Amino acid sequence: MGYVLISRKGCHLCEEAEALLAAQGIAYTFQDVDADEHLKKTYTFRVPVLLKEGRVLLEGKFTPERLSRKLSL
């Protein structure tokens, strides 16, 4: 299972996270938090959220440093 980015349209932090993942060459699956009731209840105030195997790696403001630290685990 790869990375999953839980995001929403119109979210500037989400757009920044998408750009950072793309710049780092990290492939991910996009899931719209507003399209799924479970995701909405769990993550609506936490987006963007990056998951790996169902585990939260990052949420909120993504930075290159935070992303590098989390991906090296």
Place the predicted regions along the sequence by residue.
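Short conserved loop adjoining the S-adenosyl-L-methionine
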Residues: K40
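Surface-exposed interaction regions that form or flank ligand-binding interfaces
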Residues: Y43
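Non-catalytic, surface beta->alpha helical segment in thiol-disulfide oxidoreductase systems
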Residues: R55-L73
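Thiol-based oxidoreductase modules, predominantly thioredoxin-like and allied folds used
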Residues: A27-E37
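Small/polar loops that bind or transfer phosphate-bearing groups
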Residues: I6, Q31, E59
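A short, hydrophobic beta-strand/beta-hairpin element that forms part of a small beta-sheet core
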Residues: V47-V56
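Local sequence-structure signature of Cys/Sec-based thiol-disulfide redox active-site neighborhoods
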Residues: M1-Q24
